[in-house]
């Protein structure tokens, strides 16, 4: 990292930089309008890397959602300093006037939205910065979205994104093939390829996007004897689509969920059983094997369903009490817990108890062995650690609406 030159002007600029870099991103964004010099300084690689380095131990804002409904939100972090929940930025989103858009997938602060009615326009963007890139129509017929993945640099700044769609599967020489259409922000074009699919009837709902890879939860059925994850990597080494069974599986009433934490896909399971109730947590290693991280005896865990994990702290798991209808965070290392009650008492977070109660009963209700529906998956919308503009293809115009950070972000040339 280069240091400023030792001149009076550079020393003064260095002092200003040292002050600004310790502010939250919401405050820093306002100083970009002071002058072109300040704007250039804030958008420099030096400033960005210094900010990320100083805030590396601070959580970024994040939220748990199901479609556009928000369950829980932590927006009062030091990185962004947002005044309200992340979900409220999606609710305020206005594109194409009155048309309603639906959340489909998210990765590193970017989300993929598609319009419910009329022409099927689709956008990838950042609702907080209010920047959007329109995705052109896919050349394939009868396609549907799989998700969005992102490519990042060494400090987690988003450099590019890819939108993935799939077509109708077909049988060839005894193997099932899946057509894939991939749109890249680096080229502005769709490419088509076909991969051998290890799952005969794949599920593409509620994808998990992490490290340039899409993970799709697959239920156990007559074709897939064990539930697991179908994995598609779009930024790593070229691989065919492959399947990973979930660990320690049995078709029973034990509640499970899938989430991400500290850069890993995590699998959480509660076991209500004679002789002791357990909470078990695994992480996925190299997209090939599960590693058991925690096995904790918790007497009261039988009436709880796992919801998710903290995206930056792999010791924190979030549980929902069916009996008492409240949210609880549990620290696996210290075994301390916190019950979230009246949301008015939490100034830096938002808990939507009505949404939690309605949907958690529906998606984790008691079921019989024959009705096994797989792990709970809630979308973790996590803002990146820097307010970089949404990557856009060459010659494609950025759509900028009024920024909810009190800043109109203009296209970068």
Curated annotation (Swiss-Prot):
This is Putative F-box/kelch-repeat protein At4g22430. InterPro entries: At3g26010-like (IPR055290), At3g26010-like_b-prop (IPR056592), F-box-like_dom_sf (IPR036047), F-box_dom (IPR001810). Kelch repeats lie at residues 168-210. Keywords: Kelch repeat. It comes from Arabidopsis thaliana (Mouse-ear cress). Residues 5-54 form the F-box domain.
């Amino acid at each position: 990292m280069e240091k400023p030159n030792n001149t009076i002007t550079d020393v003064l600029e260095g002092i200003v930089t040292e002050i600004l870099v310790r502010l939250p991103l919401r405050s820093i964004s306002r100083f970009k309008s002071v002058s072109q010099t300040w704007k250039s300084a804030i958008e420099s690689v030096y400033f960005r890397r210094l900010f990320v380095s100083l805030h590396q131990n601070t959580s970024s804002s994040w939220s748990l959602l199901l479609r556009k409904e928000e369950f829980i939100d932590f927006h009062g972090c030091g990185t962004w300093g947002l005044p309200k929940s992340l979900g409220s930025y999606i609710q305020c989103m206005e594109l194409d006037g009155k048309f309603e858009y639906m959340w489909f997938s998210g990765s590193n602060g970017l989300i993929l939205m598609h319009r419910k009615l009329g022409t099927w326009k689709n956008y990838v963007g950042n609702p907080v910065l209010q920047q959007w890139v329109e995705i052109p129509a896919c050349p394939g017929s009868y396609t549907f979205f799989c998700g969005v993945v992102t490519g990042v640099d060494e400090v987690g700044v988003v450099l590019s994104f890819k939108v993935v769609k799939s077509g109708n599967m077909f049988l060839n020489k005894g193997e099932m093939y899946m057509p894939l259409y991939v749109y890249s922000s680096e080229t502005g074009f769709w490419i088509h390829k076909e991969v051998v699919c290890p799952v005969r009837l794949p599920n593409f709902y509620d994808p998990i996007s992490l490290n340039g890879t899409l993970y799709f939860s697959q239920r156990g059925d007559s074709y897939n004897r064990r539930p697991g994850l179908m994995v598609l990597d779009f930024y790593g080494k070229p691989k065919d689509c492959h399947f990973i069974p979930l660990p320690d599986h049995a078709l029973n009433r034990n509640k499970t969920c899938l989430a991400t934490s500290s850069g890993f896909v995590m699998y959480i399971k509660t076991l209500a059983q004679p002789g002791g109730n357990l909470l078990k947590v695994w992480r996925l290693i190299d997209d090939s094997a599960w590693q058991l991280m925690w096995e904790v005896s918790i007497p009261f865990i039988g009436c709880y369903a796992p919801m998710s994990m903290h995206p930056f702290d792999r010791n924190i798991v979030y549980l929902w009490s069916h009996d008492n209808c409240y949210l609880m965070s549990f620290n696996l290392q210290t075994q301390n817990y916190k019950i979230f009650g009246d949301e008015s008492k939490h100034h830096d977070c938002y808990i939507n108890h009505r949404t939690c109660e309605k949907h958690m009963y529906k998606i984790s209700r008691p079921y019989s062995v024959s009705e096994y529906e797989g792990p709970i998956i809630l979308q973790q919308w996590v803002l990146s650690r820097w307010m970089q503009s949404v990557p856009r293809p060459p010659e494609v115009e950025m759509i900028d609406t009024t920024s909810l950070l009190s800043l109109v972000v203009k296209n970068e040339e």
